[in-house]
Amino acid sequence: MNEGVAEASERMLKGAGAFAHETPYAVGKHYRQINSSPDVYLVRVPFLNISTSETNCYLICDGDECLAVDTGAPTPEGAAPLDAAIDELGIDKARMSFFLTHLHMDHAGLIDHVAPKEAPIALSLTDFNLMAASSDAEYLRITEAQVSAEGFDCDLVYKSARYGMGIPSFKPEGRNLKFVAEGDVIVVGQTKLEVVDTAGHTPGHLALFHRGSGLLFSGDHILFAISPGLGLRLGVVDTMGVYLANLQKVCDLGISRLLHSHGEIRPDWRERVAWLKNHHCERIEQAAAYIAEHPGATGADVVKNLTWNVPQAWEDIYPAQKWCIVEGGIIILNHLIAEHRIAREPDANNIHHYTLL
């Protein structure tokens, strides 16, 4: 599932501008044109982590206007190719606007660097509120209680529960924020792009659809390099159900090309959607089967006995990966609850136990 650290490092060191062999369109040192009408330029912004080495950021240009879809992570190594691509293309930052598919650091982290204060920034109100709430101590306390109730050690929460939470991706004060949702239209020159709700990876994850060309700027909704993580967030009853429904929504849109955020752009996105659906459904059934064989199992029992692409020993798993597994496992349990397939009962210590219905 995850690209090795050595391989990711090698890719990052090659730089974001190694595009010459990949396109019939215009190629610059730090960008690659991937579409005309509208003109779309791909900029790879490096950011080395466990599973990906770059964020695919897109510049949509029409006349003297430009919309940037995501910005990448806030590192000097990331800022350099994005700045260089903007300069190479002769884009006036005063005529730029921004669209954030979601507010994870590797997507929104360069806003403070690249976006002028007055630049319009289109984003999800749901994810914005989440970013604000997750920096509050009460949010972490409630998350700790939720995870502890599944039978995981409190130490795991303190080491891992703030992964992806509690650190704002940018400073919103004084920003020209434009909260958008399903059906809203963003205009760049003469180009109109429709906002599509693709919640799942985050509760407010958004995509942009250009109906004329069939392009979908899809963020982390569908990836080839990894299976997108589904975030455990307070107040969301069935993240898995929402995500699976939104995978189907993309298939029904009539898109021609999926422009995702990590890894190479590929044409076989429908096959990938089918794989992702099957991948999640297999794990859901595995959880149900374990509960059938072990009635009264705790959430931790179930999650630790599912198949994950990680070291076999729980203690050997990276904290960030461990947190993603805990999130994903609880989301599966929540989905089975929402589907009325299992029951969740707390014991005297408020530890949840599961049985089939």
Segments from the language model and where they lie:
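C-terminal regulatory/interaction regions
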Residues: 1-24, 286-357
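Conserved beta-strand hairpin/beta-sheet module of binuclear metal-dependent hydrolase folds
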Residues: 30-89, 93, 207-224
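Active-site/pore-lining binding-face segments in mid-to-C-terminal subdomains
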Residues: 79-81, 85, 89, 103, ...
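Active-site HxH/HxHxD metal-binding segment of metal-dependent hydrolases
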Residues: 4, 8, 77-79, 84-186
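Metallo-beta-lactamase
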Residues: 66, 73-75, 165-172, 192-284
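A short catalytic or substrate-binding loop motif that flags glycine-/basic-rich loops and adjacent residues
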Residues: 50-52, 178-180, 199-202, 348
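Short Pro/Gly-enriched beta-strand edge/turn motifs at strand-loop
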Residues: 13-14, 37-45, 163-169, 189-191
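Histidine-centered divalent metal-coordination motifs
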Residues: 97, 101-107, 201, 205, ...
